[in-house]
Curated annotation (Swiss-Prot):
Enzyme class: transferase
Protein name: Alpha-1,3-mannosyl-glycoprotein 4-beta-N-acetylglucosaminyltransferase C
Annotated catalysed reactions: N(4)-{beta-D-GlcNAc-(1->2)-alpha-D-Man-(1->3)-[beta-D-GlcNAc-(1->2)-alpha-D-Man-(1->6)]-beta-D-Man-(1->4)-beta-D-GlcNAc-(1->4)-beta-D-GlcNAc}-L-asparaginyl-[protein] + UDP-N-acetyl-alpha-D-glucosamine = N(4)-{beta-D-GlcNAc-(1->2)-[beta-D-GlcNAc-(1->4)]-alpha-D-Man-(1->3)-[beta-D-GlcNAc-(1->2)-alpha-D-Man-(1->6)]-beta-D-Man-(1->4)-beta-D-GlcNAc-(1->4)-beta-D-GlcNAc}-L-asparaginyl-[protein] + UDP + H(+)
Naturally occurring in which organism (per UniProt): Sus scrofa
Chief localisation class: Golgi
Entry function: Glycosyltransferase that participates in the transfer of N-acetylglucosamine (GlcNAc) to the core mannose residues of N-linked glycans. Catalyzes the formation of the GlcNAcbeta1-4 branch on the GlcNAcbeta1-2Manalpha1-3 arm of the core structure of N-linked glycans. Essential for the production of tri- and tetra-antennary N-linked sugar chains. Does not catalyze the transfer of GlcNAc to the Manalpha1-6 arm to form GlcNAcBeta1-4Manalpha1-6 linkage ('GnT-VI' activity).
Length: 478
């Protein structure tokens, strides 16, 4: 059995080698490999056997003590992208493989309250065993106060040691020497000098965090250090990304508050980091993120409901002022999210302004709005690949415009695609039912039709004088 005193002996040897930096780095990494091999006897990926949790915590704290073992590892893989920053690894095991999603948090000392540990806890507790295999969490302790950082590292390693050892949690710090000038900056928007310094440093904090995370995963989501997560938020994000295959996007938004829940392709992170660093003193971070999205030619916001992340902090990191902002679209328990497979949408109805057909599909924040439809008008969803459908739900009208519903209509599904004027169309349809009070819902579709579905069609069966809002089209597949 692997004894704790053996681990202690290893670290005593390491301590004697501190003066030989380059040799220490090689030796340290070698010991980590041995350490991980031993720990694999007791750790099954993410879950630690109860009898060994205390051992894991103690060895991790000893190993990652900031005063003794925080060093700059220049010889590790270069995660820093194109911005020349040498990070300090405060709590880290090497990431063993590229993952699907990195969750980035930047945290500084607050005058009142501390929500970082609760945020990390929420990320892990709201993820399933399978989801944990696909995420990495990077925490940037961005405060220049080393005593505060030491306390936070010890708290994090005590509570989340098994996640650190499993390679899914990393705590880093970008040294103050890499920061640009933070005092005497121009006071845009008549902000007081201390607020200008706070938001300017925050931009740099996030720039260095983004820069570090560029090669860790396929996607990156930005959170604050006082956030609560929805159950299985990763699965929801995956469904959204899948539904947008073939669609150009820069930023997807899973909360309507500030920069919480902003999702990016990881390949965009280096230039986003440069962008924040270039304009760090101009405006707050969330404003810069909006400009970045526009510069990369995503004109409209793509935001999804329900929101997956909720602000939970009561005291702001700026001066400890009260911050009661809440996202009223947040749902902690996501119930039966639709799959909405990739598709093209067409309609011959007259579209009002920019309320186009695509806004009715999936949970994008928005809806289709058309002028009064006539008998025979259609709204068609053509799937990129044939699908086996379990359930369909279509909702029309809104709370504000309850009469802008489909008063007379039916829903059909079709197979047997043909090409007509560069568009794909189905040549045969089967009717599944009629709309009732502006809504349509049907289950067990795969048991009602004898073919895989290529198209779904909303068919207007009687002219109406009211305009039509199609609020949402939700499809569940087998």
């Amino acid at each position: 059995m692997f004894k704790f005193h053996q681990v202690k002996h290893i670290f005593e040897i390491l301590d004697k080698m501190r003066c030989l930096r380059k040799r220490f780095t090689v030796s340290f990494l070698g010991v980590l490999v041995i350490f991980l091999l031993f720990m694999n006897l007791y750790i099954e990926d993410s879950y630690v056997l109860e009898g060994d949790k205390q051992l894991v915590r103690e060895t991790s704290i000893h190993q990652l003590n900031p005063e003794r073992y925080v060093h700059t590892f220049k010889y590790l893989s270069n995660f820093s992208g194109t911005i020349n920053v040498t990070y300090r690894y405060l709590a880290v095991m090497p990431f063993q493989r590229k993952r699907f999603l990195t969750i980035g948090l930047s945290s500084v000392r607050r005058k009142k309250g501390n929500y970082l540990l609760e945020t990390i806890k929420s990320i892990f507790e709201q993820s399933s065993y399978e989801e944990l295999k696909e995420i990495s969490v990077v925490v940037h302790l961005a405060d220049f106060n080393s005593s505060w950082r030491e306390v936070m590292v010890q708290d994090i390693t005590q509570k989340f040691a098994h996640h650190i050892i499993a390679g899914r949690l990393m705590v880093i710090h970008a040294p103050e020497e890499y920061y640009p000038v933070l005092n005497g900056l121009k006071r845009n928007y008549n902000d007081p000098e201390d607020r200008v310094r706070f938001r300017s440093k925050q931009n740099v904090d996030y720039a260095f965090l983004l820069n570090f995370c560029a090669n860790i995963s396929d996607y990156y989501v930005m959170l604050e250090d006082d956030v609560r997560c929805s159950k299985n938020f990763l699965t929801a994000i995956k469904k959204v990304i899948t539904s947008l295959q073939g669609t150009y996007w820069v930023t997807l938004e899973f909360s309507k508050l500030g920069y919480i829940g902003k999702l990016y392709h990881s390949h965009d992170l280096p230039r986003l980091a440069h962008f924040l660093l270039m304009f760090y003193q101009e405006m707050p971070c969330d404003w810069l993120l909006t400009h970045f999205r526009g510069l990369l030619a995503q004109k409209n916001v793509i935001r999804f409901k329900p929101s997956l992340f909720q602000h939970m902090g009561y005291y702001s990191s700026y001066k400890g002022t009260e911050n009661k902002l809440k996202d009223d679209d947040f749902e902690e328990e996501l119930i039966d999210l639709p799959d909405n497979p990739p598709a093209s949408l067409y309609t011959n109805m007259s579209v009002f302004e920019n309320y186009d057909a695509s806004k009715a599909y999936s949970s994008v924040d928005g809806y289709f709005w058309g002028k009064p439809p006539s008998t025979g008008d259609v709204f068609v969803v053509v799937f990129e690949n044939p699908v086996i459908i379990k359930k369909i739900k279509v909702s029309t009208g809104t709370e504000d415009r309850q009469n802008d519903i489909l008063h007379h209509g039916a829903l059909d599904v079709g197979g047997y695609i043909r090409y007509f004027k560069q568009n794909r169309q189905c040549i045969t349809y089967i009717r599944l039912g009629e709309f009732k009070n502006g809504n349509f819902e049907v289950s067990d579709v795969n048991q009602k039709i004898p073919f895989d579905v290529h198209c779904m069609r909303i068919h207007v069966t009687k002219t109406q004088k009211e305009w039509l809002i199609i609020r949402s089209i939700s499809i569940w597949t087998s």
